[in-house]
UniProtKB/Swiss-Prot annotation:
Belongs to the universal ribosomal protein uL16 family. Keywords: Mitochondrion, Ribonucleoprotein, Ribosomal protein. GO terms for cellular component: mitochondrial large ribosomal subunit. One of its GO terms (molecular function) is rRNA binding. It comes from the Eukaryota. Its main location: mitochondrion. The gene is RPL16. It is found in: Mitochondrion. It comes from Prototheca wickerhamii. GO terms for biological process: mitochondrial translation. This is Large ribosomal subunit protein uL16m. PANTHER family: 50S/60S RIBOSOMAL PROTEIN L16, LARGE RIBOSOMAL SUBUNIT PROTEIN UL16M. Gene3D superfamilies: Ribosomal protein L10e/L16.
Amino acid sequence: MLQPNNTKFRKFQKSRVKGVQSNTDQLRYGKFGIKTVSAARIPARTIEAVRRVITRKFKRLGVIWIRVFPDIAVSGKPAEVRMGKGKGAPQYWVCKVKRGAILFEFDGISPQLAKQAARLADSKLPIKTRFVMYS
C-alpha cells in the first residue's frame, strides 16, 4: 500500500476538503483518465483496490499512472477506550482530493476497454467520478 517514508509530523489535524483543483485537472501522461466530480478523502487501501481492478481489466496491457498519493495520517483510538489520555496512534493514510482532480490515467488500450475500467473503478471509489479522454 502507498504511504510516505517519513513525514514532518506524525499526527495531522482533521480538516475539510473544499474547492476546485486547478493544477492537476488536465491529463498529463495518458489518453484516458478518471476525474473526480466531488471532493473527499480517499484511503490508501481504496487506491490500491482501484489499481488492482484496472490492472485486472487490462490483462497486463497498457500503462497506468496513479496521480494521487496518500500523505496524511488518520489517527484513531482503539475500541472501548475512554475519552481523553491524548490523541490516538496513526491508523491509516489518506489523500485529500478536490473536485476536478485526475485520480488515474491510462494509455495503450482501446477507448471501450478504458471506459469499462473507469466504470469498475467508480464502483470502488467513495466519490463520484467521470471518464475523461484527451482531445
